[in-house]
Amino acid sequence: MAIKVRFFASLRENTGLDHLEIAANDIVQQGIATAADVWTAATRGQPLPAQALCAINRDHAELGAAVNDGDEIAFFPPVTGG
């Protein structure tokens, strides 16, 4: 299986990526991979923007949260509404 990665709004523009899939084996180190590890692998080392947010399987998550094979990770900037 793979980890699905999606980018939204300015993060999509900055990375030039809409979505991709990464083999879980490519990012798992010492048995644990985090959302931040997924960002690093997906963007080939681009710095993670300080205000970036993420969701794992459509639930808000911390960037240090563990990810598993088959998860969907979304990265997006902070948003506000009115």
Where in this protein do the model-derived segments appear?
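Ubiquitin-like/PB1-type beta-grasp interaction modules and other compact soluble beta-rich domains
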Residues: 1-81
